[in-house]
Amino acid sequence: MLQVILNIRLDHKTSDVKTMESSHERMEAIVAELESSGTVMEKVPIRTCNRIEYYLSVQEIPPGFEFDGFTVEGDEDALRHILRLASGLESMIIGEDQILGQIKAARVQALREGTCGPVLDMVFTKAVHVGQTVRRKTQINRGSVSIGSAAVDLAESIHGDLKCRKVLAIGAGKMGTLVARALAEKHLSAIMVANRTYERAYQLACELGGDAIHFDRLNRALRDADVVISATGSPHYILTRERVRDAIPPERRSAVVMVDIANPRDIEESVRELGIRLFTIDDLRGVAEENRRRREAEAREAERIVEGELKLLLRSLKHMEVEPLLAEVRGNMESLRRREAERALNKIMNSSDPEGVIEALSRSIVDKIFHDIAISIRQAAERGDEEFLSMCAKLFNCKDLK
């Protein structure tokens, strides 16, 4: 490829949530360093609760460039990864749908910011298409498959049936909505939804038949909750050790389960010191493995689809590489045609032999096109360039000289 497609990433397969939190700025610094070298043509970042990724289209990778321990893949491997990612095959919860929306959003945002050009636009558009195809042709996303549903399953594995428990969901964004829907599938009667924007909390609570909580009354809701699942987009802790200590009486703390699926994390790790049972995305791996086993057959079919679509994408990208050359060749031919046509039209108006003018026109066009071709072929023969001569024979559908 004339441009190298590069994927730099850190995800749940290689890192825990704490490492991902602390590595975001390092990855951005690496991308910025690459950009400063003038080699980056396009870029699209993807950040979710369990991955940080950059897709780059670069002219070259500077010799000796260090990627500081991040996973780095190029060209075919990078393209395979984005297609697998969109299909739900790279997710912690195999088959989850949220990643497809996140890839769509990443493309739209990069287009808006002017960092996604024709190469990555083609790649991301194809990825979305493949993700949709996999979900249409397989049952990989059948049932409740999301980080949100896994968090609810984890809480249920500890507390048992949640129908007799009070559950507090913090966050009403995309991830919080997934949590809420997973709770709704359990037909729970005591669901509380808290969000900084009360209107959004109220809207989601109405859908669930639960109660919306003003954020300034979060401590009161914490006091009554048996299960807390937090999934906001806040850059800072929502539940600090001090807040939890003040909100939950000591005698209740050992019975409270908190699941933090945000990145950056919403709940300060030191709340464990209070006796609270705190779980993070890292603790969902057991749930994820069970989900993986259940979906093995569907995953194999999805992988077959991905490999077929990857071949088509590679071919399309190769076609894209030569489009400027084809456009220039066609432009040169068109300029020649116009010049010769104009000359012929001027002659034909004053000629008693229009057929002769047309004959001369066609011969002139052929001679001018053939002139440069003939020079190149003769020069190749002089230097013994058999590969070039063979290529010309194929290009003009002629017999090889051999």
Swiss-Prot record:
<dbReference type="InterPro" id="IPR015896">
    <property type="entry name" value="4pyrrol_synth_GluRdtase_dimer"/>
</dbReference>
<keyword id="KW-0627">Porphyrin biosynthesis</keyword>
<feature type="binding site">
    <location>
        <position position="102"/>
    </location>
    <ligand>
        <name>substrate</name>
    </ligand>
</feature>
<dbReference type="InterPro" id="IPR036291">
    <property type="entry name" value="NAD(P)-bd_dom_sf"/>
</dbReference>
<feature type="binding site">
    <location>
        <begin position="171"/>
        <end position="176"/>
    </location>
    <ligand>
        <name>NADP(+)</name>
    </ligand>
</feature>
<feature type="binding site">
    <location>
        <begin position="48"/>
        <end position="51"/>
    </location>
    <ligand>
        <name>substrate</name>
    </ligand>
</feature>
<feature type="binding site">
    <location>
        <begin position="96"/>
        <end position="98"/>
    </location>
    <ligand>
        <name>substrate</name>
    </ligand>
</feature>
<feature type="active site" description="Nucleophile">
    <location>
        <position position="49"/>
    </location>
</feature>
<dbReference type="GO" id="GO:0050661">
    <property type="term" value="F:NADP binding"/>
</dbReference>
<dbReference type="InterPro" id="IPR000343">
    <property type="entry name" value="4pyrrol_synth_GluRdtase"/>
</dbReference>
<keyword id="KW-0560">Oxidoreductase</keyword>
<dbReference type="InterPro" id="IPR015895">
    <property type="entry name" value="4pyrrol_synth_GluRdtase_N"/>
</dbReference>
<comment type="similarity">
    <text>Belongs to the glutamyl-tRNA reductase family.</text>
</comment>
<comment type="subunit">
    <text>Homodimer.</text>
</comment>
<dbReference type="InterPro" id="IPR036453">
    <property type="entry name" value="GluRdtase_dimer_dom_sf"/>
</dbReference>
<dbReference type="GO" id="GO:0008883">
    <property type="term" value="F:glutamyl-tRNA reductase activity"/>
</dbReference>
<comment type="pathway">
    <text>Porphyrin-containing compound metabolism; protoporphyrin-IX biosynthesis; 5-aminolevulinate from L-glutamyl-tRNA(Glu): step 1/2.</text>
</comment>
<dbReference type="Pfam" id="PF05201">
    <property type="entry name" value="GlutR_N"/>
</dbReference>
<dbReference type="Pfam" id="PF00745">
    <property type="entry name" value="GlutR_dimer"/>
</dbReference>
<dbReference type="Pfam" id="PF01488">
    <property type="entry name" value="Shikimate_DH"/>
</dbReference>
<dbReference type="InterPro" id="IPR018214">
    <property type="entry name" value="GluRdtase_CS"/>
</dbReference>
<dbReference type="InterPro" id="IPR006151">
    <property type="entry name" value="Shikm_DH/Glu-tRNA_Rdtase"/>
</dbReference>
<feature type="site" description="Important for activity">
    <location>
        <position position="81"/>
    </location>
</feature>
<protein>
    <recommendedName>
        <fullName>Glutamyl-tRNA reductase</fullName>
        <ecNumber>1.2.1.70</ecNumber>
    </recommendedName>
</protein>
<dbReference type="InterPro" id="IPR036343">
    <property type="entry name" value="GluRdtase_N_sf"/>
</dbReference>
<keyword id="KW-0521">NADP</keyword>
<dbReference type="GO" id="GO:0019353">
    <property type="term" value="P:protoporphyrinogen IX biosynthetic process from glutamate"/>
</dbReference>
<feature type="binding site">
    <location>
        <position position="91"/>
    </location>
    <ligand>
        <name>substrate</name>
    </ligand>
</feature>
<comment type="function">
    <text>Catalyzes the NADPH-dependent reduction of glutamyl-tRNA(Glu) to glutamate 1-semialdehyde (GSA).</text>
</comment>
